[in-house]
């Protein structure tokens, strides 16, 4: 819970000063973190779907729900309604534990890591992060996985603008890459 304490003690007051909010309820906060992982082209393999669910459970500490295909894709032998992967929404305590693990343990383990892209905001203060390898998380044992899969991390904030959201995420310790002009 170190990250939550940092947010409550330091980041909130810094954001209040930086953006001159009239009410403490206006200060942006992280509402939830959504993790999404698919089996990719192995969607026809039930074992691959099960592995995705198990890996998401290990990473998040919470049981994900199975995602299904919205449309049929002949090239992937995919039918509408077939299971594709898993998705989990983290809030409150689990969210802060995951963010702490992501920032302090997983991100430093990424090869040639120079920070996350500052362009991945959606215009409403939410941030999307793509992780190419699930093995950066300490819970995933390299010897036990069949295939390296990616993972989507969406950080949903109450910020109204990208600038506010970036200040919030930088405050809690997410390293953004330097943009060269």
From Swiss-Prot:
GO terms for cellular component: ribonucleoprotein complex; ribosome. Pfam families: Ribosomal_L5, Ribosomal_L5_C. Keywords: Ribonucleoprotein, Ribosomal protein, RNA-binding, rRNA-binding, tRNA-binding. Transmembrane segments: none annotated. One of its GO terms (molecular function) is rRNA binding. GO terms for biological process: translation. InterPro entries: Ribosomal_uL5, Ribosomal_uL5_bac-type, Ribosomal_uL5_C, Ribosomal_uL5_dom_sf, Ribosomal_uL5_N. PANTHER family: 60S RIBOSOMAL PROTEIN L11-RELATED. Part of the 50S ribosomal subunit; part of the 5S rRNA/L5/L18/L25 subcomplex. Contacts the 5S rRNA and the P site tRNA. Forms a bridge to the 30S subunit in the 70S ribosome. Belongs to the universal ribosomal protein uL5 family. This is one of the proteins that bind and probably mediate the attachment of the 5S RNA into the large ribosomal subunit, where it forms part of the central protuberance. In the 70S ribosome it contacts protein S13 of the 30S subunit (bridge B1b), connecting the 2 subunits; this bridge is implicated in subunit movement. Contacts the P site tRNA; the 5S rRNA and some of its associated proteins might help stabilize positioning of ribosome-bound tRNAs. This is Large ribosomal subunit protein uL5. It comes from Mycoplasmopsis pulmonis (strain UAB CTIP). The lineage of its organism: Bacteria, Bacillati, Mycoplasmatota, Mycoplasmoidales, Metamycoplasmataceae. The gene is rplE.
């Amino acid at each position: 819970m170190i990250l939550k304490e940092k947010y409550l003690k330091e980041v909130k007051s810094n954001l209040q000063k930086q953006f001159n909010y009239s009410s403490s309820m206006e200060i942006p906060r992280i509402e939830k973190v959504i993790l999404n992982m698919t089996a990719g082209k192995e969607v026809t393999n039930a074992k691959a779907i099960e592995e995705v669910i198990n890996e998401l459970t290990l990473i998040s500490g919470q049981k994900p729900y199975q995602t299904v295909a919205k449309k049929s894709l002949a090239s992937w032998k995919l039918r509408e309604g077939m299971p594709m992967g898993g998705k989990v929404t983290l809030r409150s305590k689990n969210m802060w534990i995951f963010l702490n693990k992501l920032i302090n343990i997983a991100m430093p383990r990424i090869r040639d890591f120079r920070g996350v892209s500052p362009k991945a905001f959606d215009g409403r203060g939410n941030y999307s992060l793509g992780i190419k390898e699930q093995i950066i998380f300490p819970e995933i044992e390299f010897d036990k996985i069949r295939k390296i899969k990616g993972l989507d991390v969406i950080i949903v904030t109450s910020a109204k603008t990208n600038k506010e959201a970036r200040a919030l995420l930088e405050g809690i310790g997410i390293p953004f890459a330097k943009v060269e002009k």
